[in-house]
């Protein structure tokens, strides 16, 4: 997709795509070592929840290019209805993270790989997130 087409997409559409990119990446990552399905699901949920994504968005910030930081900022400022169970700031950062991944998936797969690797390293060393009581 060319840059003009990417810029024509809504931030919500990029976040929609980025959500799928992140979910598939995490599902692939947790497959090894082989474990029971319930553990795979639990590990995946811990990594893809909004609070974990918001944490990643914050940690990625120093590693982003100017253009990527702009996509993250735009994603954070995008409109949308915040689910009642979530803090608005957390939801907006998670949406920003997803929008950035959606943008990179369309614009630069090599850079997407670098960003996903940084996310993996961060979650490996710091854990995905503290599970919420509702989960």
From Swiss-Prot:
MF (Gene Ontology) = ribonuclease III activity; rRNA binding
- InterPro entries per UniProt: Mini3_fam (IPR008226), RNase_III_dom (IPR000999), RNase_III_sf (IPR036389)
The cofactors required by this protein are: Mg(2+)
Q: Which UniProt keywords apply?
A: Cytoplasm, Endonuclease, Hydrolase, Magnesium, Nuclease, Ribosome biogenesis, RNA-binding, rRNA processing, rRNA-binding
Output one GO BP term. Answer: rRNA processing
- GO cellular component: a single term: cytoplasm
Q: What is its main location?
A: cytoplasm
* EC class (word): hydrolase
Cellular location(s): Cytoplasm
The UniProt entry, under Pfam families, shows: Ribonuclease_3
So where's the catalytic machinery, residue-wise? Answer: 19
Listed EC numbers: 3.1.26.-
Keyword DNA damage, does the record have it?
no
Family assignment from sequence similarity: Belongs to the MrnC RNase family.
Q: What does this protein do?
A: Involved in correct processing of both the 5' and 3' ends of 23S rRNA precursor. Processes 30S rRNA precursor transcript even in absence of ribonuclease 3 (Rnc); Rnc processes 30S rRNA into smaller rRNA precursors.
Assembly, per entry: Homodimer.
Q: Specify the protein name.
A: Mini-ribonuclease 3
Task: Name the source organism.
Answer: Gloeobacter violaceus (strain ATCC 29082 / PCC 7421)
High-level lineage: Bacteria, Bacillati, Cyanobacteriota, Cyanophyceae, Gloeobacterales
Please name the gene that encodes this protein. Answer: mrnC
């Amino acid at each position: 997709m060319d840059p003009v087409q990417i810029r024509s997409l809504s931030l919500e559409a990029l976040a929609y795509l980025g959500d799928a990119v992140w979910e598939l990446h995490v599902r692939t990552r947790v497959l090894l070592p082989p474990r029971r399905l319930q553990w795979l699901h639990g590990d995946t949920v811990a990594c893809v929840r909004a609070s974990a994504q918001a944490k990643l968005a914050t940690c990625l910030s120093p590693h982003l290019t100017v253009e990527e930081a702009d996509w993250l900022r735009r994603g954070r400022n995008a409109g949308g209805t915040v689910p009642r169970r979530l803090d608005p700031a957390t939801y907006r950062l998670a949406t920003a993270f997803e929008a950035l991944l959606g943008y990179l998936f369309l614009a630069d797969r090599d850079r997407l790989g670098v960003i996903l690797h940084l996310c993996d390293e961060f979650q490996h060393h710091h854990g995905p997130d503290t599970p919420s009581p509702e989960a």
